[in-house]
A protein has these predicted regions:
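Catalytic cores of the polymerase beta-like nucleotidyltransferase superfamily
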Residues: 1-157
Length: 157
């Protein structure tokens, strides 16, 4: 598994509030929950580019457990997108889209019927590009089930 060197410093320099993301993850420990940064922010971390979007996060807990943990930790959130397994966590100027790991059960081409999963590999199949399926944990370790890093670096050069 690859790791981003000097992860805390890189996050600070790029504007990712990793300390708060770790606070969210700590709140999930009762259920052995893990949280990952995913999507464009991971791409930007790898390329060492400034962050222009609020971090997208994904957790390996179902929505009910996620909401329970956040409420217990007094972390503010909005229940938007619940039927899609998604909420918004509020922190200072940030609005984190936090989504439970999901897999598609069926789709009509536009909307998918989803089911919770705790598998990065299954969740990654829903992502639009391979480099949007690179997951970064709170210590900077990268999980890359679809070889998105290779695609990202090819595109960069």
């Amino acid at each position: 598994m690859k790791k981003i060197n000097n992860f805390d410093l890189v996050c600070k320099n790029l504007g990712i509030p990793i300390v708060f993301i770790r606070k969210i993850e700590k709140s999930l420990k009762k259920f052995n929950g893990k949280i990952y940064i995913v999507g464009g922010n991971v791409r930007d971390l790898i390329l060492n580019k400034s962050i222009i979007n609020h971090p997208d996060l994904v957790v390996n807990l179902d929505l009910e457990k996620l909401l329970y943990c956040l409420e217990k930790a007094k972390i503010r959130f909005l229940k938007v997108g619940e039927k899609f397994g998604s909420i918004v966590v509020l922190y200072k100027k940030f609005k984190f889209d936090v989504t439970v790991m999901r897999k598609d059960i069926e789709t009509d081409g536009r909307w998918a019927k989803i089911k919770f999963t705790d598998s990065l590999e299954e969740d990654s199949k829903r992502r639009d590009f391979t480099f949007n399926s690179i997951y970064c944990d709170t210590e900077g370790h990268l999980a890359d089930p679809n070889k998105g890093i290779n695609d990202l670096l090819k595109k960069k050069s």
